Amino acid sequence: MWRRIEAHPKAWDMIVVGGGATGVGVAIDAAARGYAVLLLEQSDFGKGTSSRSTKLAHGGLRYLEQGNIGLVMEALKERGLLLENAPHIVHDLAFVLPNYDWWEAPFYGLGLKLYQLLAGKYGFGTSRILSREETLAHLPTLKTEGLRGGAVYYDGQFDDARLLIHMVATAFEQGATLLNYVEVTGLTKDAHGFVDGVTARDVETGNEFRAVAKVVVNATGAFSDLLRLKAEPSAAPMIVPSQGIHLVFEASFLQGESAIMVPHTRDGRVLFAIPWHGHTLVGTTDTPIGAATLEPVAMEQEIEFILATAGQYLTKAPTRDDVLSVFAGVRPLVRATGVTSGAVSTAALSRDHVIHIDRSGLVTVCGGKWTTYRHMAEDCVDQAATLAQLPEKPCVTHHLHIHGFHDEAKEEAAKEFGALAVHGSDAYEIRKLIETDAGLGEPLHAALPYVKAEVIWAARHEMARTVEDTLARRTRALFLNARAALAMAPAVADLMASELGWDEATRTKQLAAFRDVAANYVLHP
């Protein structure tokens, strides 16, 4: 891992601030065109919104209902490209809409056919109406009282943090330089008042430095306005943050390989119950919040809402005692042009991406969704390169394979590598670690599939710098079972200490920091 940016006092074509899906996507796109790219992330890659999604690569049925055909078509195309470029992480999944009223089958069936039609050659499967028996075959734990049947359609599912880490590796392979735990403390300007670089601080060492670039891209998501204010103190806010939470349960709450999709909840959102890494993931909510934080906390009313709504559809109504983990994320929704203050309905805010260029030349890319990160990046790099008068070069990411790509089908990879299959082609190298030292094949916890070799791999090759990085984003232990993650933490700290050279004081500090974060993922009775 390369931590010393000071040793490379070069002028960059582009500096990207923010290491989530959007920022890393921009770094991949720009580097693949041949531009010199530096990306700086104040915390870990995906620490914010990008690791806290509903884990869906989808077009968005709700946007279709709202009449946003353009967004749906764009997302369906990008969904198809995601599956093509990262089949080791993205896969198709059957979603069932249970029908309890006579009108639901024809109504939703028609909408799903349109959704399928809009996907064109990027379609994932054929939607159809299901009988009552077929619906229960898909969803054995669905409540049967009043059930008439259902409708099934196919969308994409993925592991968001795992995909992001492989995108980071892809950006490196294309020639970009990316650093986590480097905070941008300010923007620098030339004699004409145009942004020409950043000042930054290495969080680990405290070292400060300046980096110069022809253009700076603000890809800080929910925190976009904070960086914009450094460029233009009078800048009007663009972002209206909204919080969504998810609850995680044992797989027994949703037996089988299909997901439930509830098209209308009482807060106007869609609710999903999804099989994910051997567990059941249920969410989400849409709660306006005053300001974004790196570690948002689920509100009681959100927790109760999901428990109550899930209980309306599942034969065994989940309770607080059943929750293995609860996590919250912040959506960086974009305020409508000309609206600068006042209460705004989150349902009315834009889910489209926006690229804004301040008078000082700071390029801000925000909004959008995980599925469309590649298209957002293409659009952003096009505009940033034009602004900076960089040599015109076409986007090449449409068919650029993400790191870890291999041709094996999901089922074949799972047979060969088991839980290591999520690492794609890296699974071969992780298996070599185990072959060299059998002890590295030992599981870290009986309730989760992770082994010691994955910790070593994360520290050596995936820029994991903290216990939290490993347990939250290199593995998904914290998101799947918070108590199990807490139990694993000492062993993870020991392994990372040996790899990263921590002394006992650092190890102790790391464990304390992780326990503080993990406390918000544990739901108490």
Regions found by a protein language model. Name each.
Residues M1-M14, D29-R33:
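Extreme N-terminal leader/targeting segments of oxidoreductases
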Residues I5-A7, A11, S43, I89, ...:
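C-terminal accessory subdomains/tails of enzymes that are appended
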Residues K10-W12, T205-V215:
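Core beta-strand elements of the Rossmann-like FAD/NAD(P) dinucleotide-binding domain
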Residues V16-V17, A211-G221:
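Short hydrophobic core segments
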Residues G18-G20, Q42:
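Glycine-rich Rossmann-fold phosphate-binding loop(s) that bind the pyrophosphate
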Residues A31-R52:
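Glycine-rich FAD pyrophosphate-binding loop
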Residues K55-H138, L271:
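Dinucleotide-binding Rossmann-like beta1-alpha1 core, especially the glycine-rich loop
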Residues N180-D196:
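A conserved short coil-to-beta-strand element within the FAD-binding core of flavoproteins
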